[in-house]
């Protein structure tokens, strides 16, 4: 379903239904060793555990990928500059939320500098623990073979 006010995609399926259908190809890709997965700007309460948080900024979605699906590679956000997402939160808020949630990389097609500064400010203030960045950098370096 699409929210007519924001344009955000809402998935209302039960988790067991998603695991039996939509998520099958992701599980196969993970088992085959795919190095990265993009987390969409889609609201899926059965995965995130939250009514209004998109998967791209959700700690619940990161936890699901890491623990339930066993994925240890890079989790990359969908475009945080996306107009429908930015009707729900600002790009900078989304960037901070995504890093706090445990995303490895942020996809920002426009306005990168502002989002960078928002994340930097959140790290400097302690809102984002340095361990979150260390984890992301570690995953990136591992993926690069460094």
Spans of features found by a protein language model:
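Short amphipathic alpha-helical coiled-coil/interface segments
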Residues: 137-144
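Second-shell residues forming the walls of enzyme active-site clefts
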Residues: 1-121, 127-131, 139
